[in-house]
Structures are given as C-alpha cells and as structure tokens.
C-alpha cells in the first residue's frame, strides 16, 4: 500500500506524523493516547522495520521504547517525504528482520532549478526546511525542528514535560547518467523532565510521577546510497551507521538523594551496515539479489532495585559485539498480458551470538506472493512466507549479577513467524479500490520472561525499555483475522480510506502452555475512516474517526503491591500474572477534525490550519490504579511484612485538544 504526501500533510489528528496516518489502514491498531506504537495484524510494536531511501532507520520516534519502536512523536519530517510503501505482509526479501510491517520511505530530491524554503509553526513544534541546488549536478534537502511539546503537556495537565530537537538532510549528486550518490542523515535529541511542581495535583498524576523515570535520549543515522545504472541492470551499494544513547534515572519520591536511587540505566546501541544489491530487468522477469554485512555494539550499565519475593538489586555492565550477515534474492514475473504476477523470494540471516543463530540454513526465509486478474477489474491475491526476527539487543546483551549472558546460556533464538494471506481486490477506477483479505500468523521461539512467564510480544507499548531481562525462547502464539478496505485516492479533490478489521491475537504463556490467552493487542475489532476534501478558494477539510475494540488487560496484585519493600523498589503496582489478560476495557472511539486554508501571494504562500483532536470529548477509561498514602498499616510487623495503605484512583484519558498551525512556503 502506498501513502502519498497529501495524506500525511492534511491528515486530521495526525499532526503530520506518518505513524498516526498509518493507523488508518486495515490491520493497524492504536495504543494509549500520546503514543505512536505500530501494532499491525496482532503483532507487537517491536516487529516493525523502517527504511529511508533504502537506509534502515532503527526507530522513527522521539522518546522511543528501547527494544521496540513506539514513542509519542515522529522524527521524520513529512515535508521531504514523496511517498511511503507500507507492507503488512509479503515483506520484500531485501527488507529483513520484520514480522509485522515494513515502512519504506521514499524521499524527494532537492529542486535542481532553484532554492525554496518552508517554515512551520505546528501543534507541537517549530520547523524550518529548505531544498535546492548545490551546483549543476547536486541537490540538497535540510530541515531542523524544535518542540514546545512541554508547554502543550503542561497546559493539559500531564505530569511529564518532553522536549525534542531533530534534524534531517539529504544530498544527491549525479556524476553522470549512469552513476549517482545520495548521502542522508537523521538525528534527534530528547529530554524529558517530570512536572513535579504542578499545583492541585490529581491522584492520577501522583501515580504517574511515582514510577516514571527521567528520560534522555540521543539518536542518529547516517547513510550513503550509491547507484550504477547499466542498461537493464541497476547496482546499489548502501552503507550506514546508527547510534542510540538511552538514559533513565529514577529516585524514590523524586527526591534526588543517593539513598533514594532506584534506577540508573544507561545503554548504547551502535550499528554499522553494508548492503550490496543487483537488480536485473529481463523480459517479463525482474531479479534482485544481494547480501548484507553488519556489526553491532551494545553497551549497558544498569543499577535497578527489584522485588521478586524479596528485595533484589540488579547491577551489571555489558559490552556486546555482534557480527550479522545475510543473503537474499527475489524473482518477480509478470505475464505478457499483465494478468498474472508472481513474486518468489528467499532470504537467510545469521550472526555470531551463539550456535543457535550462526547458521544461515536455520533462518531460511522463503516467501511467495501471487496476483491474478480474474475478470476486468477483479483481482485475486495471495501470499505465504516464513519470516525471522532477531530479539532486541536489550535481550541479547542482558547479564545477571554474576556477569553472565544469561539469555545466551538459555538458548535464545531468532523469532519465527509463518504467515499466509488471501484476498480479493476490486478496482473499478484508477482512483478507487476495494479489498478484502484474510490472514493468519503463527509465532514460534518468542522470548518469554523467566520472571513473570509472559511473552515479550505482549510488552513494549509504554515508555522505558523492552527486553532487558532473562528470557527463554519458548513462547508461541498466533494472530488471525479479516480486513476490509475502501480507498478513494486524490480524485475530484477527495481522498479517503475506510477500513474494518476483525482480529484475534493470542499467545501461550508459561503458566498455561496448552491454552491460548489474549495478547495485549487482541482488540477483536478496529474501524477507521479518514479523509480530506479540497474545496474552492484553497480550503481543505479533513476528518478521522477511529473505533478500537475492547483491549485486554491484566489485573493488579494488590497483596504484593502493598508490601513496603515491593512498592519502594518499583514505585508502582505489580501485575497478577496468574490472571494474565483476563479482563477487558471498554471500546474506545475518537473523532479528529482539521481545516486548512492556503493564501497564495506573488512569491510565497501562507497556510493556516486548525486541528481538533478528540472533537467529541470521548473518554478512554483505563483500569483503576492505586497510590500509596504514605501510611504503613502495620508498623509493628517485621520490615518484610509491613504494608502501605493504598488508595484507589480512577483513570481516564480523552482531552479535547485544539491546535493552530501556520506554514509559510517561500
């Protein structure tokens, strides 16, 4: 599926953020408010991969969850995006390490004739971008953004105040008609403070401040893409380096004294990647073949107070080096009358982490997709494949207090997913399409937490870190469903997409090895309508309505949580995993509205927009939580048996959020 620039630019409630726009497509669920986690076809947020002009980007969000992919705000500036190819199945063999989706961003080239610029005062940031020529054969794109999200969050009464800065560039040089080189970069600096000075603080905000750490992140990716065009052959060489520095600090009661320190976490992820690829165009057949070589370095310095049945301090340091390699090939056949298309791909990956992972044959990944035009504008489509994903570095590099790579000893393996899908597509016009598709995904060797016997697949949609714990590759799961979509694209001023998904997502945990239980993404059903319409005199209106089915949740273990030693270690409640996802929330709906007006002048344009998120003031009711009052109900008991008095707190989210934005094009 292809997402155009206008769908990103004018999307209601999207705040010009590609992750929010993708949530309009079938099979894509949304999670908690103020986050951009991609949950595709019942898979977790850690199962997605992102590419920018062929260069892999480890994450596309500010304040991202390390080990997953979500965060509250996107990094990529939409001003430079030409289109996005979104794959929710049948992933290209050249795009490995994905189980749920691949987002392949295609950037514009700079204008070779003249320079232009854009300034944006948006709902959460101020931005400046420019593009143009750098000589006869070179063009450039550059942008810088700075947020004032902390003011918005303070205005609506949130207990955390994030600030971010990001920059992006692309330089393309055309040596001659046979050779070109593109150099691109993307970087972000994130800083989150706790809003501890709030007046008349609600109990819900007290609860969040009790456990939420201070987060600081730095990320960047630099890449170069060389292409050689030789008749029917295109050769590509892609090199890149990425880095992430993630720091979390938490003090008990947010009082910064050494004895109150409960979490001090610093982790770094460095990647160096090289990929070589050849594309051959033959009569009726296109063949792509290539290979990749990568080196990753993961470091971690962790001090964390935990509680199992007694207080425990986790204290370890990691410096893990990992060499990865892979091979892939794809053949695409299209019949002479364009009635039948087939794509057959094969991929294999390996690394030197352990004997379970160092053999390419063990991660052999075939995939096949077919399309047949049954009658005029009716197409039958099908796909099947086996896909592998490497567990996150946080899991690979986890150590116990004995300085042992415990997950290496536990036989950690690649996660495997066998997938199949079939559907029908009706294209009555070039701008109109209807689709119906059923899918099935089966998971094997998913990491399962040793501590709580829950698959990592049901984690990762919150701030913090995913996977930094002892696991075994013993969890299995499945996701299946039916997707319906109607799409009208950019005809007579109208663009819209309407989608409905019936989906089930289930896993077996360590307590119920013979029974499937709902995963955290088992919403049962999803409905989304999103559209924009261009009116006379440069007016545009847009709306987005989404309905999310009843998400499952795990009740809290109040008996354990009330223990003073347990609460002081975590500053939060503990789940009762013996009742894993046994309860469900109410369904949730939200309506967003947007209006744009553009004024054209002789040498510049002015666009003003009004965006209203949650126009119906819908309330998303979350499970009740508890906060400590500070009183110990049994002070005479031994320290290990003393309990806090806990107070119940109602939780809900759903603020009507209007915002005005201004864009100036020069």
Where are these predicted regions, by residue range?
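C-terminal beta-signal and adjacent terminal beta-strands/loops
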Residues: 444, 546-570, 586-590, 597-666
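Transmembrane beta-strands of outer-membrane beta-barrel pores
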Residues: 88-90, 107-109, 121-125, 146-150, ...
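Periplasmic N-terminal accessory/gating domains of Gram-negative outer-membrane beta-barrel systems
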Residues: 1-92, 102-108
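Face-selective signature of the C-terminal outer-membrane beta-barrel domain
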Residues: 172-190, 212-357, 373, 430-435, ...
């Amino acid at each position: 599926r292809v997402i155009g620039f206008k769908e990103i630019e004018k999307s209601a409630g999207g705040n010009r953020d590609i992750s929010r726009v993708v949530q309009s497509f079938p099979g894509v669920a949304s999670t908690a408010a103020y986050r951009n986690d991609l949950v595709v076809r019942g898979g977790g947020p850690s199962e997605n991969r992102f590419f920018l002009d062929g260069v892999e980007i480890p994450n596309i969000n500010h304040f991202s969850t390390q080990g997953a992919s979500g965060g509250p705000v996107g990094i990529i500036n939409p001003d430079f995006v030409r289109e996005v190819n979104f794959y929710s199945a049948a992933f290209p063999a050249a795009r490995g390490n994905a189980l749920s989706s691949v987002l392949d961003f295609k950037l514009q080239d700079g204008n070779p004739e003249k320079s232009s610029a854009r300034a944006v005062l948006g709902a959460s940031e101020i931005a400046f971008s420019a593009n143009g020529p750098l000589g006869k054969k070179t063009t450039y794109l550059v942008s810088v953004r700075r947020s004032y999200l902390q003011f918005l969050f303070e205005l609506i009464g949130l207990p955390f105040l994030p600030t971010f800065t990001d920059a992006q560039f692309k330089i393309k040089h055309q040596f001659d008609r046979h050779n070109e080189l593109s150099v691109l970069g993307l970087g972000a600096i994130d800083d989150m403070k706790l809003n501890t000075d709030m007046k008349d603080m609600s109990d819900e905000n007290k609860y969040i401040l009790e456990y939420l750490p201070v987060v600081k992140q730095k990320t960047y990716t630099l890449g170069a893409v060389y292409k050689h065009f030789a008749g029917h052959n295109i050769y590509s060489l892609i090199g890149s380096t990425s880095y992430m520095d993630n720091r979390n600090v938490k003090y008990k009661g947010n009082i910064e004294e050494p004895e109150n320190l409960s979490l001090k976490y610093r982790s770094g992820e460095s990647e160096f990647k090289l990929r070589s690829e050849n594309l051959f165009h033959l009569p009726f057949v296109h063949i792509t073949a290539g290979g990749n070589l990568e080196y990753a370095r993961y470091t971690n310095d962790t001090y964390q107070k935990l509680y199992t049945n007694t207080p425990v301090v986790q204290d370890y340091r990691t410096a893990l080096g990992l060499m990865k390699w892979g091979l892939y090939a794809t053949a695409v056949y299209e019949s002479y009358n364009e009635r039948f298309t087939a794509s057959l791909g094969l991929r294999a990956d390996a690394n030197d982490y352990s004997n379970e992972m160092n053999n390419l044959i063990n991660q052999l990944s075939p995939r096949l997709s077919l399309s047949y035009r049954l009658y005029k504008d009716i197409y039958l489509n099908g796909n099947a494949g086996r896909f592998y994903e490497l567990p996150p570095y946080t899991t690979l590099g986890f150590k116990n207090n004995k300085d042992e790579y415990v997950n290496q000893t536990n036989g950690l393996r690649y996660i495997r997913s066998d997938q199949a899908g079939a559907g029908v597509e009706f294209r009555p016009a070039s701008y109109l399409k209807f689709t119906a598709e059923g899918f099935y995904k089966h998971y094997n060797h998913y990491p399962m937490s040793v501590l709580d016997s829950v698959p990592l697949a049901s984690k990762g949609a919150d701030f913090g870190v995913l996977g930094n714990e002892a696991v075994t590759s013993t969890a299995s799961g499945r996701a299946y469903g039916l997707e319906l979509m109607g799409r009208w694209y950019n005809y007579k001023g109208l663009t819209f997409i309407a989608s409905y998904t019936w989906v089930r997502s289930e896993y077996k945990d360590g307590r119920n090895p013979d029974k499937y239980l709902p995963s955290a993404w088992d919403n049962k059903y999803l409905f989304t309508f999103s559209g924009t319409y261009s009116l006379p005199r440069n007016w545009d209106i847009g709306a987005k309505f989404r309905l999310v089915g009843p998400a499952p949740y795990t009740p809290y273990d109040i008996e354990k949580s009330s223990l003073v030693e347990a609460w002081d270690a975590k500053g939060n409640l503990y789940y009762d995993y013996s009742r894993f996802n046994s309860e469900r929330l109410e369904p949730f709906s939200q309506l967003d509205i947007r209006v744009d007006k553009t004024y054209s002048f002789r040498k510049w344009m002015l666009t003003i927009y009004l965006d209203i998120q949650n126009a119906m003031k819908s309330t998303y009711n979350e499970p009740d939580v508890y906060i400590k009052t500070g009183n110990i109900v049994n002070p005479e008991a031994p320290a290990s048996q003393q309990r806090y008095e806990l107070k119940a707190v109602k939780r809900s989210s759903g603020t009507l959020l209007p915002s005005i934005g201004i864009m100036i094009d020069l």
